[in-house]
Amino acid sequence: FNPTEAIRHVIVNGMVDYKSNQFYPTPESIVNDIEMYVGCTDGKRILEPSAGRGNIANRFENIHCIDKEELNTVILKQKHSNVICGDFLFYEVKKETDKYDIIVMNPPYNKNQWKTHVEHALKILAEDGVIYAVLPSGKESYFDNCEVLETYQNEFERTGITTCLYRLEK
């Protein structure tokens, strides 16, 4: 990782306001579980729609990343070639073959943004695709074909929230 571009961005634009942007990096213990459950990704189209600094994305090759914070995308581009700076909720795929086989996500939680993000992810998920999502606990009843894989307490610093790793299918 070459920090030159990231430092230049911070000097010009300042740091990201983490709280208002709902930026809570995915802890390594959860990332390890995501990687284990996803398994082999050969030949699969993979997306992380709220990629942040790449805690999840860095575990996968040829992953597509989206983040709305420019600083995060500057950092992501150091390791990944398919990076978009923009709001995931406005991201669309042009044709059926552009849909994703696997979507790994830790979306923002504030004001039920997690629900909107998962609903949008389902729209761009391939017919036999799978979503692995880190969400607040107790959300499995919101979606069909949703399974709790793991439960985590106090994994995200200064939040006190219980989260789960969910597996969703279309």
Specify the residue positions occupied by each region the protein language model found.
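Class I S-adenosyl-L-methionine-dependent methyltransferase catalytic core
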Residues: F1-K170
